[in-house]
Amino acid sequence: MRIRIVTFGLNIPREAYAAHAEQIASGFAAWPGLLGKWWLGDTASGTFGGVYLFASRHDADRSRETDLFRGMFADPALGGVAVREYDVLEAPTAITAPASRG
């Protein structure tokens, strides 16, 4: 499995972002191999983003070719987009997050 963590600041009100996120959520759900996406928002620090869980590195790599992924970097509503990806350590994760075992 592969984890992606995306963070950014907002150049629009939080409420406008939340409404937009609801509108585009189904697009992320259609990504092959995406097991889940958690939407992040911390108004106090101004940090927003998401945590994505992919079935494989290949699935994570394929998602980078989508309009949704590329659009984050061109969207004037989002500032300072940062993307980090990590492999999941399968054995300890199976103990602490048994639902991820598949």
For every predicted segment, state its role.
Residues 1-48, 57-65, 76-102:
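Short S/T/G/P-rich N-terminal loop/turn motif that feeds into the first structured element of a domain
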Residues 51:
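Beta-strand acidic-aromatic groove motif in beta-rich domains, primarily in extracellular
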Residues 68:
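Short, polar loop motifs at secondary-structure junctions
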